């Protein structure tokens, strides 16, 4: 993949297609299909499985029944990491199978069993909405974007939906403004009260993804955010840890960050590491392997 930039750039959507085909191969067995995949390319494989799982649902009741069932398997719920990939992928599938009917898709997320599931599901919806704007939505279009307001729909949706919308909003902004990072930072600084930090975390996630996890480039982009550099590095370290399913690469980023921001950066790594395994001993071992100086910050991030 590293030798073909076109494939590398589109690997998330390619992985979606592979995941969808895998579910067909295993005759709709979501648990088995999940067991055969990995988190490469920002977990596109997992997301694709859920896109395919909703094929055949027509009524709201049918969508809701499938949505509550597909991510309930014990092996999927074994870790927060896998459960999140499943429920997030469900959000993608709801958008695609409903023809980008965002209010409908959100209403199905609302019918999941827990607050965590409901919130995580919305992330897939907002990511898929942005995919439509950035030309990776299988030819479908969305009406839930505005050229005159690049933050929309985050500044329009109900408060319970805002978190994951703002965690992805800069993908929309950057795609629309030609990756003008300084302009994007200005937009984040001006979003509605209470969501500025989240917008800059999104900026950090995009800094990591757009540079293909190049630590020096991420640091340069985060430096453009001024007083929000810590939020940027937090978002970048989380994204890097998620993409590699490991904190090793992200720890290199954090080690090069400004000294006063390193603890926050390692804390970000910990928030993702904590999802890979539920045991405190595993959290301690993972953080100890990465850093001595910022071990406590990493461990706090895991929830221990």
Question: Where are the predicted features?
Answer:
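Non-catalytic all-alpha helical scaffold/repeat segments
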Residues: 1-304
